[in-house]
């Protein structure tokens, strides 16, 4: 659903940020 997709996007963004920081 929408909430699920939103959570997925948040997780992906978090992962991307971590990769950039590392």
Swiss-Prot record:
GO CC entries: extracellular region; host cell postsynaptic membrane
Chief location: secreted
Modified residues annotated as 4-carboxyglutamate in this record: 3-4, 10, 18
Subcellular location: Secreted
Record GO terms (molecular function): ion channel regulator activity; toxin activity
Function recorded in the entry: Conantokins inhibit N-methyl-D-aspartate (NMDA) receptors.
The protein's name: Conantokin-Oc
